Every structure is written in C-alpha cells, then in structure tokens.
C-alpha cells in the first residue's frame, strides 16, 4: 500500500481546489434547469397576478352582466370568447 506524504496530499488538495469550481460550473446548471412547461406556467402565473391587480371596465356584451371586479386573465378570455360567439350568432 502506498502512503501519501504531506506534499502529495497538499498537491492533491491544490489540484482538487482548482478543478472543483470548473466541475461545478459544468455539471450543476444542467441539473437545475427547469423544463419549458414550468417556465410557461411561471409566466402564466405572473400574468394572472398582474391581471388580477387591474380594475376592469364593464364588459360591453348584451347577454352578459357588466362586471366590476378584479378578475383573472382566464376569466377575461372566456368572457371575450362568449361575447364574440354571441355577436356572430346575432348577425
């Protein structure tokens, strides 16, 4: 069995301290990358939070009641789709 001297141990630790940061830079970011779907979900969550903080004007749609409230973006989109469908059906 080979015994390491003090100089061998210090040289190994010095080499390890020089290589370890580059190894961390190479391997750690790839393990922490989020999938694209989670980024989209995060962006949607931010958008919904922004939309919920905006006070809305009443909807100009004859078949739907006018709504004054803080609503989410999804609610707005469904109301707009319903309004467009009703408008197309009338013509």
Curated annotation (Swiss-Prot):
It is a single-pass type I membrane protein. The chain crosses the membrane at residues 9-29. Residues 30-91 are cytoplasmic. The keyword Transmembrane applies. Keywords: Cytolysis, Host cell lysis by virus, Host cell membrane, Host membrane, Host-virus interaction, Membrane, Transmembrane, Transmembrane helix, Viral release from host cell. Changing residue 29 to A: Delayed lysis onset. GO terms for cellular component: host cell plasma membrane; membrane. Belongs to the microvirus E protein family. Induces host cell lysis. Inhibits the host translocase MraY activity that catalyzes the synthesis of lipid I, a necessary step for the host cell wall biosynthesis. Most of the references in this paper show that residue 89 is Arg, in most other phiX174 proteomes the residue is Gln. We have chosen to show Gln at this position. This is Lysis protein E.
